[in-house]
Structure formats: structure tokens, C-alpha cells
From Swiss-Prot:
UniProt subunit comment: Heterodimer of AddA and RexB.
Function: The heterodimer acts as both an ATP-dependent DNA helicase and an ATP-dependent, dual-direction single-stranded exonuclease. Recognizes the chi site generating a DNA molecule suitable for the initiation of homologous recombination. This subunit has 5' -> 3' nuclease activity but not helicase activity.
Other facts: Despite having helicase-like domains, this subunit does not have helicase activity.
Gene3D superfamilies associated with the record: 3.90.320.10, P-loop containing nucleotide triphosphate hydrolases
Entry GO MF terms: 5'-3' exonuclease activity; ATP binding; double-stranded DNA binding; helicase activity; hydrolase activity, acting on acid anhydrides
Documented EC number(s): 3.1.-.-
UniProt keywords, alphabetically: ATP-binding, DNA damage, DNA repair, DNA-binding, Exonuclease, Helicase, Hydrolase, Nuclease, Nucleotide-binding
Family: Belongs to the helicase family. AddB/RexB type 2 subfamily.
Pfam families (alphabetical): ADDB_N, PDDEXK_1
Name of this chain's protein: ATP-dependent helicase/deoxyribonuclease subunit B
Tree of life domain: Bacteria
Gene name of this polypeptide: rexB
Length: 1192
């Protein structure tokens, strides 16, 4: 029953020595088994490699080889090997989820006895920490009784803090109760190990051998197991990494191999005490790395122990360091290097390479896409967590919908899992339904829908009212209405019955049954199986295993919940907390790599040393050395207080200080994984943009060996760069990746106007001859690309617009603001995604509807404005607001409290507008005779004839719209008609904009009025009086406007804020009579007119007055601009010519199409259309001259 140690530094081929020892033991104990015990993570590869070495030693030529007396096992598999027929394996294994549930139940049942856990509901996260702590106790051979003893000793120690005393008091109670529960129904890994230890102690293992390798430390229970092997007369050989065997009892904490030396001393002391024979240690000598890596090893061992030595490298190529600008550039260069090394050395295989980093999560979204592009196969040696699977997301969303009462985010999360949909013959996989979901999401966002509106019986109504041309109930809108109501009804009909069932559940088992029934009834299990079958068909076997494993894990957790907490009162929050906690630790089973693949793994994990070239990426000071976090339930200080009271065979996980001291050793193991080459790399900045620094370990190595870290550019340039290897080689990888860099280089060369490097010309030639030839030419042609829209082909114009363009005036104004933007918006019909925030179009629609209702009230009730008092005005305003609340098209205001608040703000403005309009009408003889007057066909409605303009052979433009308000005034024997246009901000008639086609609306409206005077007012032959803007606003006064003012003065100041702007006809009688109060003040508070003391119009007022000829010329000019716009649109002309006004304001400032247009004023081909500032007289003069010139 001897104990023997084998040792040697990491540069030695330990597996060779183990293979030799296996054969020796077999020869010494013929027919007896040899067990090779390794960490579970490397068991599969260890088995393959050891058998290969044994096959070579036995000179077996066949590739098929087996050893019946050699077993390669992990410790857990060793337990199965010896105990598989015992009763212990009849018990269900405790999982992380069942452990959490048991602890949760234990804490609930003993809450009155506990000090820290009065409210476990609020501390569910602590349950996981306690579970981890109890597992550490069990692995440390510290049972409930031992913990109770320790707690008593510490409680008697006056120096101990109250925190540790309270924690140990509670842990003692919880641990004892937890173990009682475990023993009665489950078995966990520690119990199995302890049972194996007990059973082995009773066996006679004489002649049987156990070789243990790959461990950096052992838990107390693992040490007890190994000691049991020796007690049972087994031959135990422990293989450790160290350069020399310790000769003295005292271990130096400065030694790189401190932990391994402690293992030796512990086992030797135990062997001596138990009279177990210790054989002479065996020093392994067969070196597996090259001379440069041996020098690195020698330096690292000596420098870590304070003895700096070593010599310069003979070949700098064996250890290199490079810095990249980003993690992306870093990984891209690693992949490029792998391809180049394989190209230069055909004997290299993918499996000769390993890419390691301390935390793969830093590179989780980078490595696979880059290696796929580089056509490099990888084995991603990291277990994938189940917690992000759609099944768990569906259950979480389901419970969140119930908890937050149909919040938008939760409902969409549920529907977007892809698992819940109505299965029909026409749509068996729900593809059409998911299209409806996306449409519904846009509608819900726009309307701000949540809560009871998902449950209402009344159908949702989809409508668009931000543009008059969109008011027609199109077939598309009818379809959208059907789709959104299909989704609404499906959600209500599907989840509400489940919620009702869950509400009646009083115990955990009733709730679990309700959830299970819901999932089965809605075919969730069948959908998961369909996913599996689809991925199997596509050959994605690893992906295909995920749905089934997730479902099995969920069912197991549900069974555990029913078994452990089924009789407890049901709490939805705690149920989901336990379910999420269970999935947090659940991972998919991974198939070990047997293919020729590059290993991508984490450097903190034990690795096989079967690679030739190792890349250590992300070698920064943040992770090398690792920053140890102390997040355990018992912190390090607490464990230090426990340690003196533990027996020799009891100890907890190594301390944080010892972990930090072990960092040089763990990194040393990583350095020595490869046999031929070691390459360090690190990025200048992380994913968060924070600057990163090189690891002090790597910095030490570089400084000692004179290795200069190369700072590698992320893209090629035309400037000469001195690097080794040559600069150009940095960018030659797969055809696809090389093409990307060729484009970058060509662009840099194009911009610098320099000659191309002949080597890049050669690369271009090679790529053109490859399968990427056409793509290469296509991408290179982009260098000549200019951001200039192409003229549309006639067939495209025909498809977009037909023979007739139906447009509102505002659309045509948008054309003159930027022709390309018009094409995007009205040709391609690109729209921004609507949200529940109020847009200017939404508020404008609301105000327009309110004013329309008001004007109809006024004309219907035939009010006398001179006699209406303040109280009556307020009553009318109140009635108007009530009517608006009942208008279904504004249901979006019922979506949220915020929208309700905004509606109150709008209503307050409406009430102010009502009062202002009544006061204005009391001062003038102008009276509204029409509101929202249609012209042209809009949807199913029609009004006055549209304005039709021929713009070429068979083409025409049909201008239609709504005039907000038409007013009429009678002066003497003459009648006048004027228009009022509502605006959300102060507006004056801008003659410059009118000239350039940017302000045609008022002029075209007047054109409609004068063409249809008899239809508007058949009893009269009216003339045009005015075109005026009225602002929608809730007026605010500046301090100078209200200071020292009485109530009447304040009301007057507020009233002035609503004064109308625009222009009036130059008609002396009209101007004098339009405002009855103007004689008193010489200035109208309603209209833009004022008189001097001499009785003439002021200069400002002159700008608001137009003669009949001037007005007609402006209208003709607007008609001309409409025709010109139509001609350009039908010709397919698409200039990107955004307007820039004289104040340097541009139309691009608020354009939603910036990302589409990519307009850049710095580009020579992109220019603003500069608008020259013109005053009224200049505009009228230029229009007159142009019309005379063209004979109009």
C-alpha cells in the first residue's frame, strides 16, 4: 500500500511518465487494474492521449486499441465505478435548483429560530450563497455537528464580531435541518464521495493502483478519499507539477509550487502517522517544449521566488507580444496568424493551436464570427448557460405580465419567444402570426397600450391621421386592423385563463400543475421538438440538443418544486426566483471535441498540454493576475476565525490571499501548455472603451528577454511601417478577410492619391481569380462611389407614382426642401417607427379636430359673439373637451398616465384657444363659414374639386387637402372670403419661402377658394380678403409683460398672443372695417395691421398687405412650382439638395432620413441648396419679371 509522488516542472511530458508508470504497475501486479484519476474537465482527452501512448509502447499498429485493465476516470466517475450497484445510486441526485428549494423551505420552517433571516422573501439571492457555503463545508469535511462546535467556540470568544456569531448561529440551524432533509430523500456529490471513502476503507485494494494527476489542490473530502485508497492497500501515485521535491517540513510561501508542496507534506505526514510506506519520489525528465520555452520556465520559477536569472532568448519568434487597438483587431490578428502559420508549415493541424483568455465572456461576441470568416474551425470549450433560452424567457414574461398587468415590454417578450402562437392549417409554424406581432408592437408603441386595454372586448382601431393623404381606409389598413386584433384577442384568450387558474392556486403543487397544463395546452413542448428536428435536419447537432435539454431541466425543476415545496403556500415571486436560480447554474451538455479544431478556452481551467502553439489573448493587468472577489456568504475574515477550531482533516477552500499567491503558478501552467510557441496579446481598450494596460506578468517577461511588444494597426495604410513580420502580412488571412483589408488599403490609397504597393496588386489579382472575383470588383468599384442619387428609370417612376400624383401642398413643399427626402418618404414610403410620444403631427391633429368641432358648434348654434359672456365661453370649452374625450381616434391618450397628463395639457390649450377665438370674433365682422374644407378626393370623402395640373404627356398632378377654416365678411355691398390656417408655432407669411416653393400652402388654398367661390358661398360673388395663421398655444407671459399689470391688462396681454399673422388684400374698406376696435388704438390685436398717427399703414403692416395683382402673381407662381415639381418627379430626377436658409438653419437638422441619405456637406458632391434672403418687394418684382418673360 505504498504512496509515491511523481513530479517535474510543466515543461516535462508528465503523460509520458504516467504511461511508463502504468506499464510498470501492470507488470508488478499482473491482472490488477490501474485507475488514472484526473479532473473531470479533461477526462475525455486524457483517456484518448494515455491510450495512444500505451498503444505506442505496446507497438500496436492498428488504430483500434483498448486496455481492459486501465480505467481513466474523474473522482465522480470513480464513485460510480465502485458504487454503481449500491443503494446510494437509487436516490435522486440533488441539483442546484433542488438544493435552493430545500434551503428555502428549511429557512421558512426555522425562521423564528434565526437571527438574520426574518424576511426570507426579500433575501432569495442569499439562498444561493448559503447553498454554496454549505457545499464548501461538506467538501471541507465540516458537518453540521462540527459546525455547531465551532459556532459554540466562537460564540464564547469575546473578540469575535457579532456578524460572524450571527451567521454561524443561523448556518448551524440551517445546515442541520438541511442535512436531515437531504438524507431522507436525496444524495449529493459530497455524500457520494463520503460514501465512497467509507466503502473503500472496508475494501482490500491490494495490487490495484491509482495514479492521480492534473490537480493543483484537493478539497478535504478528496484528500480523505485518497487516504482511504491507501488504507485499503491500494498503490497510490500522485503526479504534481514542481521543479524539485521539497526536503524539509517547512514550506516557503514564496515558492511558486507552494500549494503542491503543501499537498506533499500533508500526505507524507498522514502516511507516516498511519504507517503507510512512502516510495522514493520519481523525477520526470522527458522535456516536451523547445529551448526558448524552457528558458521562460526557468526565469519564471526563479523570478517568482525572488531569484532573477535566466538568459536571453535564442529565438525571439518562440515568445512574442503584440498590442492591438481593440479586442476585435486582436482576435482578427490571432486568426490571421494561425492561417499564415498553417500555410507556411503544412504539418500543422488546427488542433495544434489553442487560444486562451482568463474570461471568455470578454470575447463572447467576437471570436466565433471572426474565426468563421477566417474559415477556422473552433471548439468553444465553455459551457453554455440555459438561462437565456426562450422557454425560460416565456415563463418569466408570463409571470411578469401577471405581476405588472399587461405591460408592453412583458407582452412583447412573451410573443417574441417564438414558442407561443396559434397553430392553424395555413400557418402551422406561426410565421404569419409573428408578422402580426411585429405590426402589433408598432401599434402598441404608438398608442401607449398597456393594462386593461389588452383585455377589452372592443376591437382596437388602427388609423393614420398625420397626413391627409393617409386618411383613406386602405386595404392595407384593413389588414392591419385584422392583424392587431388577432394578436390582442389571442393574448387575452390564452393567458387570462392561466392567470385565473393561478389565482385560485393555494399551494405550490396547484400552481405547478397550472403552469405545466398551460405549456402543454399551448404546444410549447411540441414547438421545442420541432426546433430540435429542424436543427438536426440542418446538421446543427449541438444546437439541436438545446431544446430537449432545456425542457428536461425545466420538468426536473418542476418535479423538485412539487416534491419539496408543493405543500407550501404558493408565492409567484419566490417560485420564479427559484426557477431562475436553478437555470442560472444549468448548462447544456457539451460533446467533447474529437475533430481537428482550434481549442478556445479559459486560462483559469485545467488544460491538456497537447498543443504546439498557444495564444494568450486579453493579457491585461485586470485579469493577469486575476482580481479575486470576496462574495461568499462567509467572507475571508470569517473563515479565518473558523480555521483554528477545525481538525487536521478539515479545511475550507484556500483563502483569497493564497489564491492571489497561486496566480503566478496558474499562469505558469498556461505559459507551458504549448510546446513550440507562446504568443501574448492585449487590446488598448476594452469593450467599454476604457484604456487597458499590459499584464505585469507579460511586461516582466518582455523586459527580461528583450521582447518588444509590437503595436499592430487594425487596418492597412499607405505609409511605410516597419514591423516584423512585414506589415502587409498582418492583413493576409482568408480570402474574405483579406478582401476586407484590400478594400481598406485601396480606399486609403485612393484618398492619398498614391501608387499601390505591388504586393497588394498581387493580392488583388489572386482574389479576382478566386470565387470572390465578382465581389472583389464590386467592392473596389465602391471607391469611385459618390453620394449622388441616380435618376430613376421610367418603369420605376411608373411603379412608384403611376400616371397621377395625388399630393397635398405640404408634400410638394417637402419636395422643395429636399427632393431626395420626398422620394424616400412618398416614393418608397419609408416611415419612422411610431412611439407613444406625441409628435407635432399628433398634437396638430388633436387641435385641428378640436377647432373643427368648435367651428361647427359656432355655425350650428348661430351665436352672437358680442353677447356671449365669460361663463358661456367656459361652458362651450368644457363641452368641447368632453366631445374630444369621446373621440375614438384619440384613444392613445388613454394608454398611460403620462399620456393622460399630456391630454390635460392639450385640453388646457384648447380652452385658451376657445376663449381667444370668441374674443377675436367679437372684435371683427369676419365669421367662419366652413371648417376642415376638403378639396379633392380624400379616402371616401370628397369636397371641392382638386387642383389638377398637366405635367407632361398623360401625366398630371392632383393637389388635394383640407383648408382649416374659411371666414367671410360683408362690407357694404361686397363680400370677402379669407382663410385661417392653424399652426403649432408662430408663423408669418415668408415671401422668400413662397418664391422657392417652400411656402405654397396658403397660396394654393386661396387658389382653391377663388376657383370655387360660388360653391363655398352660392349667394355671393366674393373676393379674397386674407390668408392668416393662427397659433395653437397656451400663452406664457414674460415678466415684463405682467409686472405691475392688473387683471384686465393681463387678459389683454394674453389675448394679443393669439393675434393672426399672414396677409390681407389691399382694400381700403376691408382694412378699415375688419377690426371694429382699430379706431381706438390704431393697431389691431387680431390682424397684422396698424396705422401711423397720419392714418397710413405702418411699414411692418405694409409687408402684410398685397394688391390683387400681387396676390394673383403669387398664386400663379405657386401653380408653376407645383408643375415644376411634378415634371421633375415624373422624369425620375432625385437631387439630394437639402435647403439651407439664410440663418444657416437646414432641413437636415430634424430629418429622420439622415442615416439613409448619408448627406455630408464636407463631400464635394453634397451641397446645400442655399436660399437667398429676399424681401417682399424683391420677390414680387422677380415673379413679375419671370412671368412677363415667359408670357404668363
Amino acid at each position: 500500500m505504498p504512496l509515491q509522488f511523481m513530479y517535474g516542472p510543466a515543461s516535462i511530458d508528465h503523460l509520458e511518465g504516467i504511461a511508463d508508470r502504468v506499464i510498470e504497475l501492470q507488470q508488478q501486479n499482473v491482472g490488477q487494474p490501474v485507475y488514472y484519476l484526473v479532473p473531470n474537465h479533461i477526462k475525455f482527452q486524457s483517456e484518448i492521449q494515455l491510450l495512444q501512448k500505451l498503444r505506442q509502447r505496446r507497438d500496436v499498429k492498428s488504430h483500434i486499441f483498448a486496455e481492459k485493465d486501465v480505467q481513466i476516470l474523474s473522482i465522480s466517475r470513480l464513485a460510480w465505478f465502485f458504487l454503481r450497484n449500491s443503494s446510494i445510486y437509487q436516490y435522486p441526485r440533488v441539483t442546484s435548483s433542488s438544493s435552493n428549494m430545500l434551503l428555502y423551505r428549511v429557512i421558512l420552517e426555522h425562521q423564528d429560530e434565526l437571527t438574520l433571516f426574518h424576511n426570507i422573501d426579500a433575501q432569495l439571492g442569499l439562498v444561493q450563497k448559503i447553498a454554496t457555503q454549505l457545499a464548501e463545508f461538506k467538501q471541507g469535511n465540516v458537518g453540521p455537528d462540527e459546525l455547531g462546535r465551532v459556532a459554540e467556540n466562537i460564540a464564547e470568544n469575546s473578540d469575535a464580531g457579532m456578524d460572524i456569531k450571527a451567521k454561524l448561529h443561523d448556518l448551524g440551524i440551517i445546515y442541520s435541518a438541511y442535512e436531515e432533509e437531504i438524507q431522507s430523500r436525496f444524495i449529493d456529490a459530497s455524500d457520494i464521495t463520503h460514501t465512497l471513502t467509507d466503502e473503500l476503507s472496508k475494501m482490500d485494494l491490494s495490487g490495484q493502483s491509482f495514479i492521480i494527476s492534473g490537480f493543483s489542490n484537493f478539497t478535504a473530502e478528496e484528500m480523505s478519499l485518497i487516504q482511504a485508497l491507501m488504507k485499503a492497500n491500494g498503490n497510490v501515485v500522485i503526479d504534481l507539477i514542481m521543479d524539485k521535491f521539497p526536503l524539509y517540513e517547512k514550506v516557503s510561501e514564496n515558492s511558486l509550487f507552494f500549494e503542491n508542496e503543501k499537498i506533499i507534506f500533508k500526505f507524507n505526514a498522514w502516511a507516516h502517522e498511519n504507517k503507510v510506506k512512502s516510495l522514493e519520489p520519481v523525477r520526470l525528465h522527458r522535456v516536451r517544449v523547445n529551448s526558448d520555452l524552457l528558458k521562460l520556465e526557468k526565469y519564471w520559477i526563479e523570478s517568482s521566488e525572488g531569484q532573477v536569472g535566466g538568459s536571453k532568448q535564442e529565438n525571439n519568434a518562440c515568445v512574442t507580444i503584440f498590442q492591438a487597438n481593440s479586442r476585435y483587431a486582436e482576435v482578427e490578428h490571432v486568426a490571421t496568424l494561425i492561417r499564415q502559420k498553417m500555410a507556411k508549415d503544412p504539418s500543422l493541424k488546427f488542433s495544434d493551436f489553442s487560444v486562451l483568455t482568463r474570461h471568455l465572456s470578454d470575447y463572447s461576441t467576437i471570436i466565433k464570427p471572426i474565426f468563421d470568416q477566417m474559415e477556422l474551425p473552433i471548439f468553444y470549450d465553455l459551457q453554455i448557460a440555459m438561462k437565456d433560452h426562450p422557454l425560460l424567457e416565456l415563463i418569466n414574461a408570463l409571470f411578469d405580465i401577471r405581476a405588472h398587468h399587461f405591460r408592453y415590454e412583458d407582452v412583447m417578450r412573451l410573443l417574441k419567444t417564438g414558442l407561443l402562437f396559434p397553430e392553424t392549417e395555413d400557418d402551422p409554424h406561426g410565421m404569419d402570426f409573428f408578422k402580426s406581432v411585429h405590426i402589433t408592437e408598432n401599434y402598441v408603441l404608438k398608442q401607449g397600450i398597456y393594462g386593461d386595454r389588452w383585455l377589452q372586448k372592443k376591437d382596437w382601431k388602427y388609423s393614420r391621421f398625420n397626413d391627409i393623404d393617409e386618411e383613406k381606409q386602405t386595404d392595407e389598413e384593413i389588414e392591419i386592423n385584422q392583424r392587431i386584433n388577432t394578436v390582442k384577442n389571442y393574448v387575452a384568450e390564452t393567458v387570462v385563463p392561466f392567470f385565473n387558474q393561478l389565482s385560485t392556486a393555494t399551494t405550490g403543487v396547484e400552481a405547478a400543475k397550472a403552469l405545466y397544463d398551460f405549456l402543454i395546452k399551448n404546444g410549447i413542448d411540441q414547438c421545442l421538438l420541432a426546433w430540435r428536428d429542424q436543427w438536426i435536419e440542418e446538421g446543427r447537432l449541438a444546437k439541436a440538443a438545446e431544446p430537449e435539454q432545456t425542457w428536461e431541466t425545466f420538468i426536473q425543476m418542476l418535479d423538485e418544486f412539487v416534491d419539496i415545496l408543493g405543500d407550501q403556500p404558493f408565492d409567484p415571486d419566490n417560485f420564479m426566483g427559484l426557477l431562475n436560480a436553478g437555470f442560472e447554474g444549468a448548462t447544456y451538455s457539451q460533446i467533447p471535441s474529437t475533430l481537428d479544431q482550434i481549442l478556445v478556452s479559459e486560462s483559469g481551467m485545467v488544460q491538456m498540454v497537447d498543443r504546439k502553439i498557444v495564444f494568450i489573448i486579453g493579457a491585461t493587468d485586470r485579469v493577469m493576475p486575476e482580481q479575486i472577489q470576496d462574495n461568499d456568504f462567509l467572507n475571508q475574515d470569517g473563515k479565518n476565525q473558523i480555521d483554528p477550531f477545525l481538525d487536521d482533516d478539515q479545511f475550507l477552500r484556500i483563502s483569497n490571499d493564497r489564491q492571489m499567491r497561486q496566480e503566478p503558478y496558474l499562469n505558469y501552467l498556461t505559459f507551458m501548455i504549448g510546446s513550440d510557441e507562446l504568443i501574448f496579446s492585449y487590446p488598448k481598450s476594452g469593450n467599454d472603451g476604457v484604456e487597458l494596460k499590459i499584464s505585469p506578468y507579460v511586461e516582466r517577461i518582455g523586459k527580461h528577454f528583450g521582447i518588444i511588444a509590437q503595436s499592430l494597426p487594425s487596418r492597412p495604410t499607405t505609409e511605410p511601417v516597419r514591423l516584423d513580420p512585414p506589415f502587409i502580412e498582418l492583413f493576409i488571412g482568408s480570402n474574405r478577410s483579406t478582401l476586407s483589408h484590400l478594400i481598406q488599403y485601396a480606399r486609403a490609397m485612393h484618398e492619398a492619391k498614391s501608387e499601390a504597393d505591388p504586393r497588394w496588386n498581387l493580392i488583388y489579382t489572386i482574389l479576382r481569380q478566386s470565387t470572390l472575383g465578382s465581389l472583389t470588383d464590386q467592392l473596389l468599384s465602391s471607391l469611385e462611389y459618390k453620394n449622388i442619387p441616380e435618376k430613376l428609370k421610367p418603369e420605376i417612376v411608373e411603379g412608384l407614382y403611376g400616371d397621377t400624383i395625388y399630393a397635398s401642398v405640404s408634400k410638394l413643399e417637402e419636395f422643395y426642401r429636399n427632393e431626395y427626402s420626398y422620394f424616400l418618404k412618398y416614393g418608397l414610403k419609408l416611415q419612422e417607427r411610431e412611439t407613444s410620444d406625441l409628435s407635432p403631427a399628433d398634437t396638430g391633429q388633436y387641435f385641428h379636430a378640436a377647432m373643427d368641432k368648435l367651428i361647427k358648434m359656432i355655425t350650428t348654434e348661430n351665436l352672437n359673439f358680442n353677447e356671449v359672456n365669460q361663463e358661456q365661453i367656459e361652458q362651450i370649452a368644457k363641452r368641447l373637451v368632453q366631445q374630444m374625450e369621446q373621440d375614438q381616434q384619440f384613444d392613445q391618450f388613454n394608454g398611460t398616465y403620462r399620456m393622460g397628463f399630456l391630454r390635460k395639457q392639450l385640453d388646457r390649450t384648447v380652452q385658451a384657444m376657445v376663449e381667444a377665438i370668441f374674443k377675436q370674433l367679437a372684435r371683427t365682422r369676419m365669421r367662419p363659414i366652413a371648417s376642415e374644407q376638403l378639396f379633392g378626393q380624400i379616402g371616401s370623402q370628397s369636397g371641392l374639386p382638386a387642383l389638377n395640373f398637366k405635367v407632361g404627356e398623360g401625366k398630371e398632378i392632383n393637389v388635394r387637402g383640407k383648408i382649416d377654416r374659411i371666414d367671410k365678411i360683408e362690407i357694404g355691398d361686397k363680400d370677402y372670403l379669407g382663410i385661417v390656417d392653424y399652426k403649432s408655432s408662430n408663423r408669418k407669411f415668408d415671401f422668400t419661402d413662397a418664391y422657392y416653393g417652400l411656402a405654397m400652402q396658403m397660396l394654393m388654398y386661396l387658389d382653391v377658394v377663388q376657383r370655387n367661390k360660388e360653391k363655398i358661398d352660392p349667394a355671393t360673388k366674393a373676393e379674397i380678403s386674407s390668408a392668416l395663421y393662427m397659433i395653437f398655444q397656451y400663452p406664457l407671459l414674460k415678466s415684463k409683460e405682467w409686472k405691475g399689470s392688473d387683471a384686465n391688462q393681463l387678459n389683454q396681454s394674453i389675448f394679443k398672443k393669439f393675434s393672426l399673422n399672414g396677409f390681407l388684400l389691399k382694400d381700403e374698406e376691408l382694412i378699415k372695417e375688419i377690426d371694429k376696435t382699430i379706431e381706438d388704438t390704431r393697431k389691431s390685436d387680431v390682424f397684422p395691421i396698424a396705422f401711423t398717427t397720419k392714418g397710413t399703414l405702418t411699414k411692418v403692416s405694409e409687408n402684410s398687405i398685397l394688391s390683387e395683382d400681387e396676390l394673383q402673381n403669387l398664386i400663379k407662381h405657386a401653380e408653376l412650382k407645383v408643375r415644376e415639381a411634378g415634371e421633375k418627379i415624373f422624369k425620375g430626377e432625385l437631387d439630394m439638395n437639402p435647403v439651407q436658409w439664410p440663418n444657416r438653419r437646414t432641413v437636415m437638422e430634424y430629418s429622420p432620413y439622415k442615416d439613409v441619405m448619408q448627406f455630408d456637406a464636407m463631400l464635394p458632391e453634397n451641397n446645400y441648396r442655399i436660399i437667398e434672403k429676399l424681401d417682399k418687394d424683391k420677390v414680387l418684382e422677380q415673379i413679375r419679371e419671370e412671368q412677363e418673360k415667359n408670357g404668363r
